[in-house]
Swiss-Prot record:
Presence of the UniProt keyword Nucleotide-binding in the record: yes
Gene: gatA
Protein name, entry field: Glutamyl-tRNA(Gln) amidotransferase subunit A
Gene Ontology MF terms: ATP binding; glutaminyl-tRNA synthase (glutamine-hydrolyzing) activity
Function of the protein: Allows the formation of correctly charged Gln-tRNA(Gln) through the transamidation of misacylated Glu-tRNA(Gln) in organisms which lack glutaminyl-tRNA synthetase. The reaction takes place in the presence of glutamine and ATP through an activated gamma-phospho-Glu-tRNA(Gln).
InterPro entries: Amidase, Amidase_CS, Amidase_dom, AS_sf, GatA
Family to which this protein belongs: Belongs to the amidase family. GatA subfamily.
Length: 482
């Protein structure tokens, strides 16, 4: 599979045109979609028009950026003007946004070619992409298994080679966990590094947009294109954005890496434990100083998240009422009946469950006991990370406690589904950057991801460690046979 730089070289040397690259991607999608089902909407016409614009620039001698002419898939909770944005929900069936998200605007300005919108768990709530109202996405490594979630469509599209890069969103692990399950690179940036303007909100204090790629450099290039201050997002950080590729050095001498003790133990698949331990040994061989670090409140991340995220979701999802856009229940008796029936018929069971949990946690009698307490624990989790980063540069642990599970295996038991984000959730609560990269396979040939966690705005260190490991191992060159 080519990298962004290789495709860029082919474009500037006129070996291939952007139109040819786009046509190849669209053909591959047509060929593989009956098996993978990663896309909800294909934007072939717009993609070819964008590719032709890039070809015109090349023909007139205009210098093009590295992302110009590169096919990309976009998770379907990012607003794209004039193109359906469903969030995987029946309640937004037929919704066409009148405006563009900041990240997709930046990608269009960079010349990237959007080939389509990818499937997701409804409103990004889920860990398997089985909560989509539209279709089930398959894991390209084993079509009977889930790709992870909620950004399962984006992860599967990149793993299958339907597209080189993709965007996802991550509220509690929705980029990193599917990246682990599908054997690709996935990054959740520092909270506020990438604008959320035009991202349909799930939990606003946790949501963050990030890249999927087949290798670390492509992820770094994509982050560089979407990161940066945006006055349209009040939580956007006003910090300079470096060229992240300058930190890709295959040497870890002097780097201090901490293994989070609390991530090893009960609930961790022994094969995941074995493979990630081997990966950590490899980091040591590359010159890093590795030690064990305790984050005592790490295991409280899951219950804390399942109070805070549903509370924010119950407020954010109050806006879907059938009045202005999306689905409206037919023939309601009156206004109140229209509201209740639209929401009852439009939302799926997991979204309803989380709205109920959130409404309960925010109710007068329980606010202090649940929501306020969860916010206090969130602060303690942040403090554990702060203490850890006084001792080490980067923290490491498995991305997910297991490899990809069979479709339908966990749908009847929401709690077992929630546990698949055990390792990723604390990173969102603390607003830190976290990257998952492939580090091996289990005995069934399913990918395993290693999670690298950096301090606030230390994507540079995360990329450096990830790149050094990637260059010393063969995992990023392994692709599923479809």
């Amino acid at each position: 599979m080519a990298s962004i730089r290789e495709l860029h070289q082919q474009l500037v040397s006129k070996e291939r045109s952007a139109k040819e690259i786009t046509q190849d991607a669209l053909e591959k999608i047509q060929q593989l979609e009956p098996k993978v089902h990663a896309f909800l909407t294909l934007t072939a016409e717009q993609a070819l028009a964008q590719a032709e614009r890039v070809d015109q620039q090349i023909a007139t001698g205009t210098e093009i950026g590295l992302l110009a002419g590169i096919p990309i898939a976009i998770k379907d909770n990012l607003c794209t003007k004039g193109i359906p944005t469903t969030c995987g929900s029946k309640i937004l069936q037929g919704f066409i946004p009148p405006y563009e998200s900041t990240v997709t605007s930046r990608l269009a300005a960079a010349g990237a070619v959007m080939v389509g919108k990818t499937n997701l768990d409804e409103f990004a709530m889920g860990s398997s992409t089985e909560n989509s109202a539209y279709q089930l996405t398959a894991n390209p490594w084993d079509l009977q298994r889930v790709p992870g979630g909620s950004s399962g469509g984006s992860a599967a599209a990149v793993a299958a080679g339907e597209t080189l890069i993709a965007l996802g969103s991550d509220t509690g692990g929705s980029i990193r966990q599917p990246a682990s399950f599908c054997g690709v690179v996935g990054l959740k940036p520092t909270y506020g590094l990438v604008s959320r303007y035009g991202l349909v909100a799930y939990a606003s204090s946790l949501d963050q947009i990030g890249p999927f790629a087949t290798n670390v450099e492509d992820a770094a290039l994509l982050l560089g294109a979407i990161a940066g201050h945006d006055p349209q997002d009040s939580t956007s950080l006003n910090v300079p954005i470096p060229d992240y590729t300058q930190f890709l050095i295959p040497d870890l001498k002097g780097k201090k890496i901490g293994i989070i003790q609390e991530t090893y133990g009960e609930g961790l698949d022994p094969q995941v434990e074995q493979v990630t331990h081997k990966a950590i040994q490899q980091l040591e061989e590359l010159g890093a100083e590795v030690r064990e670090i305790s984050c005592p409140r790490f295991r409280y991340g899951l219950p804390t998240y399942y109070i805070i995220a549903p509370s924010e979701a119950s407020a954010n999802l109050a806006r879907y009422d059938g009045v202005k856009y999306g689905f409206r229940s037919p023939d309601p008796e009156n206004l109140l009946s229209m509201y209740t029936r639209t929401r009852a018929e439009g939302f799926g069971p997991e979204v309803k469950r989380r709205i109920m949990i959130g409404t309960y946690a925010l109710s007068a009698g329980y606010y202090d006991a649940y929501y306020l307490k969860a916010q206090k624990v969130r602060t303690l989790i942040k403090q554990d990370f702060e203490a850890a980063f006084e001792q080490v540069d980067v923290l490491v642990c498995p991305t997910a406690p297991t490899t990809a599970f069979a479709a339908g295996a966990k749908t009847a038991d929401p709690l077992s589904m929630y546990l698949s984000d055990l390792m990723t959730i604390p990173v969102n609560l603390a607003g830190l950057p976290g990257l998952s990269l492939p580090c091996g396979f289990d005995q069934q040939g399913l990918p395993i991801g290693l999670q690298l966690i950096g301090n606030v705005l230390r994507e540079d260190l995360v990329f450096q460690v990830a790149y050094a490991y990637e260059q010393a191992t063969p995992w990023h060159d392994r692709h599923p046979q479809l």
